[in-house]
Curated annotation (Swiss-Prot):
Residue numbers of Phosphothreonine PTMs: 182
One term of GO molecular function: cyclin-dependent protein serine/threonine kinase inhibitor activity
Source organism superkingdom: Eukaryota
Phylogenetic lineage: Eukaryota, Metazoa, Chordata, Craniata, Vertebrata
Alphabetic keyword roster: Cytoplasm, Nucleus, Phosphoprotein, Protein kinase inhibitor
Positions of post-translational Phosphoserine modification: 23, 191, 194
Subcellular location per the Swiss-Prot or TrEMBL entry: Nucleus; Cytoplasm
Tissues/organs with expression: Detected in testis, and at lower levels in ovary. Detected at very low levels in testis tumors. Down-regulated in bone marrow cells in acute myeloid and lymphoid leukemia patients as compared with normal bone marrow cells.
Annotated region (Interaction with CCNA1 and CCNA1/CDK2 complex), positions in chain: 75-99
Phenotype upon changing residue 194 to A: Reduced phosphorylation
Post-translational modification: Phosphorylated when part of a complex with CCNA1 and CDK2. Strongly phosphorylated by CDK2 on its C-terminal region spanning amino acid 149-221. Less intensively phosphorylated by CDK2 on its first 75 amino acid residues.
GO biological process, one term: negative regulation of fibroblast proliferation
Cellular component GO terms, alphabetical: cytoplasm; nuclear body; nucleoplasm; nucleus
Name of the encoding gene: INCA1
Name listed for the protein in its UniProt record: Protein INCA1
Length: 236
């Protein structure tokens, strides 16, 4: 590193690092006198220094017949019992009789068809049990089989005046309604409702009621109606 006459380095941030020397740590006398343990014995180093013998390079002699068939032991699989190569290489044909027995069950009915029929029978049996329980608890109610009639006052909800027995059933059996549902009951609880249709119906009803209210007020008090005021002014 070049130094100027005034003793300032050319590169101000470069400084000469100090030379540090470390002495080896002092060892105990027991460690210095004890010999280092050898991982490998003398036999290993002796065999490593020797040249490889020709027996190492020789391959294990395997008969050509056993090498082709893959059998390592003599007499285990004699070649006379093996099938010919063309029989081993060709594709196996499916047996139609076994396929028909697997796919078809008793009476020549396929297994999938039998499973579906069993499932449908189970569903019918469960539905019949549910209907019997409902008849025992609620009896035969004629209101449950009637369709939903939307009232003009309520937006999509049946009026209580038309179905008074529904309110009695709800008050008497509030918890059993969710457990068992007949198709008629489900029709009462569910209706093809959409928010757009409902909003349009409510808006049309509000406009109709507003128009009727304005006509009634105009007839009663024509001075408050702007059209009535114009007519009154023209007549005067």
């Amino acid at each position: 590193m070049q130094v100027q006459d005034d003793g300032v380095n050319l590169i101000p941030f470069a400084k000469c690092s100090r030379v540090v020397s470390r002495s080896p740590p002092p060892r105990l006398p027991s460690q210095s006198l004890r010999p280092m343990p050898q991982r490998y014995g003398d036999v290993f180093w002796k065999n490593l220094n020797q040249r490889p013998t020709p027996t190492w390079l020789e391959e294990q002699h395997i008969p050509p017949m056993l090498r082709a068939t893959g059998c390592s032991q003599l007499g285990l699989y004699p070649p006379e019992q093996l099938p010919p190569p063309e029989m081993l290489w060709r594709r196996k044909k499916r047996r139609p009789c076994l396929e028909g027995m697997q796919q078809q069950g008793l009476g020549g009915v396929p297994a999938r068809v039998r499973a579906v029929t069993y499932h449908l029978e189970d569903l019918r049996r469960r539905q019949s049990i549910i209907n019997e329980l409902k008849k025992a608890q609620w009896g035969s109610s004629g209101a449950a089989s009637e369709p939903v009639v939307l009232g003009e006052e309520g937006c999509g909800f049946p009026s209580t005046n038309e179905y008074p027995d529904l309110e009695e059933e709800r008050a008497t059996y509030p918890q059993e309604e969710d457990r068992f549902l007949t198709p008629g009951r489900a029709q009462l609880l569910w209706s093809p409702w959409s928010p757009l249709d409902q909003e349009e119906a409510c808006a049309s009803r509000q406009l109709h009621s507003l128009a009727s209210f304005s006509t009634v007020t105009a007839r009663r008090n024509p001075l408050h109606n702007p059209w009535g005021m114009e007519l009154a002014a023209s007549e005067e």
